[in-house]
Structure formats: C-alpha cells, structure tokens
Amino acid sequence: MKNPRVHEIATAMIDAVRKVLVDHQ
C-alpha cells in the first residue's frame, strides 16, 4: 500500500505539529 499522496500529507502534518511545538517552547 504505497500512496505518495498520503505520505506527503502525513509529512506535512508532522512538520506542522513540530512547528507548533517549537513555537510554544
């Protein structure tokens, strides 16, 4: 089950979460 789109969205979500966590530190 290799869907590049899903991987792309997951990476973007992780990136956004990391940004928020870093901003709140």
From Swiss-Prot:
Entry's cofactor comment: Binds 1 Fe(3+) ion per subunit.
Lipoprotein as UniProt keyword: no
Catalysed reactions, semicolon-separated: 3,5-dichlorocatechol + O2 = (2E,4E)-2,4-dichloromuconate + 2 H(+)
GO molecular function per UniProt: dioxygenase activity; metal ion binding
Record GO biological process: catabolic process
Induction: By chemostress caused by the herbicide 2,4-dichlorophenoxypropionic acid (2,4-DCPP) and its metabolites.
Annotated pathway: Xenobiotic degradation; 2-(2,4-dichlorophenoxy)propanoate degradation
Domain of life: Bacteria
Keywords in alphabetical order: Aromatic hydrocarbons catabolism, Dioxygenase, Iron, Metal-binding, Oxidoreductase
Entry's EC annotation: 1.13.11.-
Named cofactor requirement(s): Fe(3+)
Family: Belongs to the intradiol ring-cleavage dioxygenase family.
The protein, known as: Chlorocatechol 1,2-dioxygenase 2
Organism: Delftia acidovorans
